[in-house]
Design a protein with these regions (language model features):
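Catalytic cores of DNA base-excision repair glycosylases
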Residues: 2-179
Length: 179
């Protein structure tokens, strides 16, 4: 089977069986989604959804979180993986949102990646989910499965996988394709 046929088959299957693909993380605004995605690194969405209600309640804006400390944030997120690093990233992210972006989560992938705790995958999730940009978030699962079913030519990195996938997926489907 040719690669183009493989892509078409996969996209058709998902369009038929999962017509509304969306994140399982619970959030009400871009700031909350950014926090949730940062926390979800090497952690389940279920666990993140258990701890974010209290975090979102007590730190409803970047301004409030920026005024806090990583020690305080740690107490809210202690049950996620790597809470020490993530608590520092969240406070740093909030401070940078306030100082560099007027408290607004940026839509540009390069700008997003300047925020502490935000790598390419997280930036792509925010760009695609919040701003409906054609950004492909490639995590370890997408990377592994894309290689396994022949959507890529044995790419060696998530970035190689991302570039290969976006070449073959229609632009309007990219924002939902990573789900």
């Amino acid at each position: 089977m040719r690669k183009e046929e493989r892509y078409k088959g996969v996209l058709n299957w998902f369009n038929k069986h999962v017509p509304v693909a969306e994140t399982e993380l619970h959030y009400d605004n871009p700031y909350q989604l950014l926090i949730a995605v940062i926390l979800s690194a090497q952690c389940t969405d279920k666990r993140v959804n258990m701890i974010t209600p209290a975090l979102f309640r007590d730190f409803p804006t970047p301004e409030v979180m920026a005024a806090s400390t990583s020690e305080v944030i740690f107490e809210y997120i202690r049950s996620v993986s790597y809470p020490n690093n993530k608590s520092k990233h969240l406070v740093g992210m909030a401070k940078m949102l306030m100082s560099d972006f007027d408290g607004v989560v940026p839509s540009d992938i390069d700008e997003l990646q300047k925020l502490p705790g935000v790598g390419r995958k997280t930036a792509n999730v925010i760009a695609s989910v919040v701003y409906n940009k054609p950004a492909m978030a490639v995590d370890t699962h997408v990377f592994r499965v894309a290689n396994r079913i022949g959507l890529t030519n044995n790419s060696k990195t998530p970035l190689e996988t991302e570039k290969e996938l976006v070449k073959h997926i229609p632009e309007e489907q990219i924002p939902i394709a990573h789900h």
